[in-house]
Amino acid sequence: MSVDAGSSGRVEILALDGVPEIVPGDDLPAILGDAIERTVGLLPMRADDVLVVTQKIVSKAENAIVDLTTIEPRPEAVAFAERWDRDARQIEVVLREARRVVRMERGVLITETHHGFVCANGGVDASNVGPESGHLVTLLPRDPDASARAIREAVRARFGVDVPVIVSDSFGRPWRWGITDVAIGVSGLVPIEDLRGTPDADGRVMKSTIRASADEIASAAELALGKIAGRPVAIVRGAKPLLGEGSIADSIMPREYDLFG
């Protein structure tokens, strides 16, 4: 898949072929290296490539998985689940993973995770977990930046190109239906680009524009991956993000800017 990126040229999105079902303990960087070699038209890797890896396979490889049959839900989780036809055990896992509960009403549970992400269900997810997914859920990786860094270092060692890596996940957005992929971990790029103080196309100085470039790349990759196609990894070629040793924490808005709390 390719799209016109305007003045920056053309952006290509290449989904990797042959990534197998990931299980806990798998050497994910090595598996991704094998998939890169198998994907027609991908090699040689280029300096303007960005590797986007979906959270689910990172979590599975790192054994960030909970067996719901081992969970004893608290009364609050049971009451919420019974009222809104939810699984009390999954609600309990979400509450355990939460730094704080932002909203818990009308069947919706929005929390702040220990990473600082504010999202539905704290990133706890029962989809695409594997053959026994009826009683398993995945958690977000403990340190998504570290996960991205390990993949980046392995790719650099194997292919000799320092390719930035994004770990992506699907988030909702306030006041809009639907989900889109965003970056939850990065290595080798700066997740946001502060354009304040630079002139726009008409010469006016921009005063508030901060570009979420890592989120844009993660969302672009999802166009080639899809939610049910079984393709969890893509190369986004030509996006040209701002390179550097950034952290996903750079993209998290401080609490004092919260207008809805």
Give the ranges of each region predicted by the language model.
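N-terminal and secondary-structure boundary signal
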Residues: 1-261
